[in-house]
Amino acid sequence: MSKVIGIDLGTTNSCVAVMDGKDVRVIENAEGARTTPSQVAFTESGERLVGQPAKRQAVTNPENTLFAIKRLIGRRYSDPTVEKDKGLVPYRIVKGDNGDAWVQTRDEKYAPSQLSAFILQKMKETAEAHLGEPVTQAVITVPAYFNDSQRQATKDAGKIAGLEVLRIINEPTAAALAYGMDKKNTGTIAVFDLGGGTFDVSVLEIGDGVFEVKSTNGDTFLGGEDFDARIIDYLASEFKKEQGIDLRTDRLALQRLKEAAEKAKIELSSSMQTEVNLPFITADQAGPKHLNIKLTRAKLEALVDDLVQRTVEPCRKALADAGIKASEIDEVILVGGMTRMPKVQQVVKDFFGREPHKGVNPDEVVAMGAAIQGGVLKGDVKDVLLLDVTPLSLGIETLGGVFTRLIDRNTTIPTRKSQTFSTAEDSQTAVTIRVFQGEREMAADNKMLGQFDLVGLPSAPRGVPQIEVTFDIDANGIVNVSAKDKATGKEQAIRIQASGGLSDNDIERMVKEAELNAEADRKRKEAVEARNHADGLIHATEKNLKEYGDKIPAEDKAKVEGDLTALKAVLDSEDAESIKAKTDALMQSAMKLGEAAYSAGQSAEGAPHAAGAEASAQSRTDDGVVDADFEEVDEKKGH
């Protein structure tokens, strides 16, 4: 039975884990790292890079290196946060055909779900390489404060990546699961999760294998990216004061500033001062300009103070919704890379009145929790029950544009709730049900999830028809809504798909594209491996030709030279089969050279060493396995 993997699809980095017996193992990627940058890049040659290779070339290809895509997922192009994001990133955010925020790179437009799928594919491949078997099922985490559109878009990303998403689980809940699995103690914990792009705080009660979320709150547009933006802004302003040049208008310089800002931020978590040094950042008529600015921890804390303080109000609301005081929290768990910042830790300590727990790895704990939930769903992990909540209230628009709640925030899910409504006008034969999610009193101020019509109502005075509206939230936090006319039994139901969102046809097309790309990637990898092998053979053959070419018949030498030229001609192609065929041909013809080299070695070293020469030749060809000389020892001696 194949394993279920747990994936933390992060704004800045992603991580994958799997249950290994009773333990959870975080899986290293092909580059040997336990986390993978959530970045996708498209090169000039049309190659797609994901993870570390994408991040490495970002400075030279800023417009086509896409990062922090999670902040766009499930959002409309008209969303104010998208407008804000457009000023922070060097790539182009455009309006998708469905009205959602998409990304334009080179000549293609991509949905955030599609780009997230490329990252999920990388995590899937990482797990498959480690496990040695195909992986088809996953539990994927999302910020607790993600709305329905964002959850649905994340699930779509999993499908495009070729994964059956068994469950969408909230990040703080996953972290609590990983933290509390081995602990026998019971109590109330708060999970403070400040990552690369989002902030969540959840209050949970843990006891006897039951993890019950009491409340959750957060901000889906607050994280490390915002801290980086403040540093970038400061560096650019200081440079403009000194040199009169605004680096913010130069995409290449902006990307270098971003890398430097991230590095400085990390360094200032452990040191009091750092120096940002970027030679040749720009140039004018007078020549090249260099950026060299000292940044202290105190200055950084002043720059981001309001961002750190923004985490306090959600904490206050989460405690109020849970009906407890800060002093009643037994443990505060820090999750997300930004919680390494001393200022953040101090604010947490001041608010909760206790030192936060630092015993979990903030970058890996969420993926570990997702893997545990995968084990629970598979039946491999027993006696664990997870009770999560819906982060935002759900309801419909009623007369006067009022938002009428059917399900309040922090209601345990899965849940189902019905309420009866009526018509607003005489002889009304159809009603439009408009579904919203949020906490404001007027529907228009909340997030509209979708709408549908219930038609064919019998003509009657206003207030007479009885229309029952039912909300159903599944364990993923995804909403289904139905409306039924009690008199006729007519019913209309929808799985909420935001007025934007991807249609089934879109998803199907993207799944096919992903499969085609996977095949293209496999062929590209085969070509690279074939090229590497051919390169080594060309080098060895040319060396042997110089040394031993005159020791073989002229026609054999001509054959080797011909095959060598033929292999060089196809070396730069992407046709792995052609490279392999020409490599095999050269290997065959070059055997004569090998024999000449062997004979020369034999005559030079003398017959007694011939066997040794053969052994050494053998040791070099057997896939890098080195044969060692050994001496047989008579065990009876010396005992």
UniProtKB/Swiss-Prot annotation:
Residues 597-639 are annotated as: Disordered. Residues 603-617 have a biased composition (Low complexity). The keyword Nucleotide-binding applies. Induction: By stress conditions e.g. heat shock. The modification Phosphothreonine is found at T198. Residues 624-633 have a biased composition (Acidic residues). GO terms for molecular function: ATP binding; ATP-dependent protein folding chaperone; unfolded protein binding. Pfam families: HSP70 (PF00012). Keywords: ATP-binding, Chaperone, Nucleotide-binding, Phosphoprotein, Stress response. It comes from the Bacteria. Acts as a chaperone. Belongs to the heat shock protein 70 family. This is Chaperone protein DnaK. The lineage of its organism: Bacteria, Pseudomonadati, Pseudomonadota, Alphaproteobacteria, Rhodospirillales.
